[in-house]
Every structure is written in structure tokens, then in C-alpha cells.
């Protein structure tokens, strides 16, 4: 489970960096858990170079290395390239890790909502291998649903969108557009995640006021700024000119972490140094409770909501997952024929943060077609300029949602 959480964390930073290349100074928000889950369900059927590329991009390769080094097992001289074959026993820990996380997230609870689901929509005339259906159910609880892509693609699209909308409490609507589902579509693999929780310590609505949010040194926009004074775990990174705060949700099973640069320099958002230095190892180290100090804080945090919808096809190709999108794609783990390729990877996400807490949801469809300083005084933590944030499942240390807030949405 820890290895899969680390894989998702490394993928989070890689994906953010790639999205940042074309979205500088813009808001970015996505669910690395949702994207990784949908792609892992696809990876379950991948073979050869298709599987190797997917494993590299999703950081499954490191997880397998970690597994093989922790289990003292003599090498039988198998060719190295076989190591990440999804049928190979050593890839099993990847899929088992996803199963454990899925079970942990979907555990019944009264205090907050966290759930995630997978589903396979398949053209009713297209035969999937029983082994694939069995494994996808075993590891991903993914039930196959037969639909009529061939002659009723629009009806199939609506059915998928309705399922996603239901799974996400209507926060993700119209995940798939008419252009996404065609008569040539054979398979759509979908993951949905929904999260809603109240803060452990809530903001008082009467203390919320209109204040400026600085977009740059000279530009600002008004926002509804929430305020409270309370004790929170804080990390101060003087050398890197930023500080981080952990805002726990009720029961402390999940937290939002906010990474805030000390200030904005001319012509920047203030996030540049942090983004240059950002790695998953550092993020894990910073968010370690042993690194953080319980501090009395005057916390100012804007109310905000973000929504995004992206086709990740080009992004994933640029990250190195190329073969899966071509006629050379090999998904013979799900069919006898070598006639399937991924045509799109659609991801839609939503987050809303207010005085009570946070609501966040996301869905991903893979469309397959033919040092800390101790502070004794009150620390001012005023989030009035661009920042990074992520929502983490604390026990497994899995990043469920990750984002950058640069600009308040009208």
C-alpha cells in the first residue's frame, strides 16, 4: 500500500510539472488518485512496451523494485524486461496496493464522506477475456457493464455520465462529451472519487470579510477571506522562503496541506522557487508530523472553488506513455486480438473550500478505441497570494487531490 501511495505521489509531481508547462500562472486542480486508478485498471491488461511505458510514467517500476528488494528472493535470471508484465507475480503488489487503498477509502463512516469506484463499460458485441474481468473485479471492484457503443453511442455516453454524476453527488456532470464516445469505441474504463468533510476546527462565517488576494506584486482581486486563531501543525522552510500548514478534517483521517511562499517578488507569483524544488520525497518529508510544530496561528484563508476538465492524452504521451495511444498498443491482457488503443483520457475535477470544510470530486475515463523553527508568538499565516494545496489520506499518505490556486474565479 505504501509503495502504491509513493507511486501516486511521484506521478502527482510529474503530472503537475507537465501541466504547468502549458498552464503557467493558471489554476491547476486534479485527482492523482482518480487518474492513477483508471490507468492502473488499463495497465492490468497491458503487455510488452505498452506495459513498460505505463509502469515508468505511473512510477510502478519503483514500487516493484521496492517489493523485490524487501523480499529476499533469489533471481532466476529472468529477463529484466519481464519484471513489469502485469501477469508477472511481482506486478501483483501494485494491484494489491490499489485494492487495499480502495478498501480503506470506502470503509463505512459517519463523520465524513470518502468513496471511490471503478467501472468498465464495454461494447456488448466485444468479448473481454474472463481473466481480465476476474482480476479487474478482484483488485479494482470494477463491474463490467455492457453497452451499445456501436449503434447507440449517445445513449451509452449518457449512461456513463449518469453513473459518474451519481458517484460524485452531482459534482461531476457531463464527464464525456458527444465527441468522446463514438461507434468505434470498444471500452471505457472509469474511476470516480468523492470527498466531503468538515474541518476539525471550523471557521466562523461572521469573521469572513472581503479582502484583496494578490495575483502578483502589483495586481490583486477581491476574495471572501475566512479567519480564525487556533493551533495547527506548521513547517517553516526559511531557506526555501515558504511555510506550510496542515488543516485537519474531522477525525484527523484526512488533512489539507497549504504551501505558501513568504512573499511575491517582481514579475512572479512567488511560487517559482517552490515549484523548481518540488519532489514527492520533499513533499512527504515536509508533511511528516515529526517535521511540523504545533503553533498558534492567525489563519486567513480564502473561500474558493475550482473546476477543471482536461484530456490528458497529449500530456501522458509527453511524459513517455506513447505506445498505448498508437496502433502498436498491446492490451492482450483483456482481449485475444491486438486491435485496441487508448484514444482519450478525460479527467474532470471539482473542489470547494468554505468555513465548514471541503467538498471535492473527480472522475477519469480512459477511452479505448479501435529544519523547523519553534515559535512562541502567534504566527501570521495569511493566504492572500498564490499557493499550492493538497488533500491527503493520512494513514496511507495517499494524495487524493492536488492543486495550485493562482487566481480567484469570478
Swiss-Prot record:
Region (M-loop required for interaction with nucleosome linker DNA): 61-69
Outcome when changing residue 99 to Q: Reduced interaction with DNA
Required for oligomerization and DNA condensation: annotated span: 356-372
Motif Nuclear localization signal positions after renumbering to this chain: 80-84
Highest taxon above the source species: Eukaryota
Effect of mutating residue 214 to A: Reduced interaction with DNA
Protein localization: Nucleus; Chromosome
Molecular-function GO terms, alphabetical: chromatin DNA binding; serine-type endopeptidase inhibitor activity
Tissues of expression: Detected in all major blood cell types. Highly expressed in granulocytes (at protein level).
Primary location recorded for the protein, binned into one broad class: nucleus
Keyword Repeat: no
Reported effect, residue 358 to R: Strongly reduced inhibition of cysteine proteases
Region feature Disordered, mapped onto this chain: 68-91
GO cellular-component term (any): chromatin
GO BP terms: chromatin organization; chromosome condensation; nucleate erythrocyte maturation
Record-linked InterPro entries: Serpin_dom, Serpin_fam, Serpin_sf, Serpin_sf_1, Serpin_sf_2
Keywords: Chromatin regulator, Chromosome, DNA condensation, DNA-binding, Nucleus, Protease inhibitor
Reported function: DNA-binding protein that promotes DNA condensation into transcriptionally inactive heterochromatin in terminally differentiated avian blood cells. Promotes tight packing of nucleosomes into spherical clusters by binding to linker DNA and subsequent oligomerization. Acts as a cysteine protease inhibitor towards CTSL (cathepsin L1) and CTSV (cathepsin L2), but does not inhibit serine proteases.
Summary of subunit composition and partner proteins: Homodimer and homooligomer. Interaction with DNA promotes oligomerization.
Family in the record: Belongs to the serpin family. Ov-serpin subfamily.
Protein's recorded name: Heterochromatin-associated protein MENT
Source species of the chain: Gallus gallus
Amino acid at each position: 500500500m505504501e509503495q502504491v501511495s509513493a507511486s501516486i505521489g511521484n506521478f502527482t509531481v510529474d503530472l503537475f510539472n507537465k501541466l504547468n508547462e502549458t498552464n503557467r500562472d493558471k489554476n491547476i486542480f486534479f485527482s492523482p488518485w482518480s487518474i492513477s486508478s483508471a490507468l492502473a485498471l488499463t495497465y492490468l491488461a497491458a503487455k510488452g512496451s505498452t506495459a513498460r511505458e505505463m509502469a515508468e510514467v505511473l512510477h510502478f517500476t519503483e514500487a516493484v523494485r521496492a517489493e523485490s528488494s524487501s523480499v529476499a528472493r533469489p533471481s532466476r535470471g529472468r529477463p529484466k524486461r519481464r519484471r513489469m508484465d502485469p501477469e508477472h507475480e511481482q506486478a501483483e503488489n501494485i494491484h494489491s496496493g490499489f485494492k487495499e487503498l480502495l478498501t480503506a477509502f470506502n470503509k463505512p463512516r459517519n463523520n465524513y464522506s470518502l468513496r471511490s469506484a471503478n467501472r468498465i463499460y464495454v461494447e456488448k458485441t466485444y468479448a473481454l477475456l474472463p481473466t481480465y474481468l476476474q482480476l479487474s473485479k478482484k483488485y479494482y471492484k470494477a463491474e463490467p457493464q455492457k453497452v451499445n457503443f456501436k449503434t447507440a453511442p449517445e445513449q451509452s455516453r449518457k449512461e456513463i455520465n449518469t453513473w459518474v454524476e451519481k458517484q460524485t453527488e452531482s459534482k461531476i456532470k457531463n464527464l464525456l462529451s458527444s465527441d468522446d464516445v463514438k461507434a468505434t469505441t470498444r471500452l471505457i474504463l472509469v474511476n470516480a472519487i468523492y470527498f466531503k468533510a468538515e474541518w476539525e476546527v471550523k471557521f466562523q462565517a461572521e469573521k469572513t470579510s472581503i479582502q484583496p488576494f494578490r495575483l502578483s506584486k502589483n495586481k490583486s482581486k477581491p476574495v471572501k477571506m475566512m479567519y480564525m486563531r487556533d493551533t495547527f501543525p506548521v513547517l517553516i522552510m526559511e531557506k526555501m522562503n515558504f511555510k506550510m500548514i496542515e488543516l485537519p478534517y474531522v477525525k484527523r483521517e484526512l488533512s489539507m496541506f497549504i504551501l505558501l511562499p513568504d512573499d511575491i517578488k517582481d514579475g512572479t507569483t512567488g511560487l517559482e522557487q517552490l515549484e523548481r524544488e518540488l519532489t514527492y520525497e520533499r513533499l512527504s518529508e515536509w508533511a511528516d508530523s515529526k517535521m511540523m510544530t504545533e503553533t498558534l496561528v492567525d489563519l486567513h484563508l480564502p473561500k474558493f472553488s475550482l473546476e477543471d476538465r482536461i484530456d490528458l492524452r497529449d500530456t501522458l504521451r509527453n511524459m513517455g506513455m506513447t505506445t498505448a495511444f498508437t496502433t502498436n498498443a498491446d492490451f492482450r491482457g483483456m482481449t485475444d486480438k491486438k486491435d485496441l488503443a487508448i484514444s482519450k483520457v478525460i479527467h474532470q475535477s471539482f473542489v470547494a473550500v468554505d468555513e465548514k470544510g471541503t467538498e471535492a470530486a473527480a472522475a477519469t475515463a480512459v477511452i479505448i478505441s479501435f529544519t523547523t523553527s519553534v515559535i512562541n508568538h502567534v504566527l501570521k499565516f495569511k493566504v492572500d497570494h498564490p499557493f499550492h494545496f493538497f488533500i491527503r489520506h493520512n494513514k496511507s499518505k495517499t494524495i487524493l487531490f492536488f492543486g495550485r490556486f493562482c487566481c480567484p474565479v469570478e
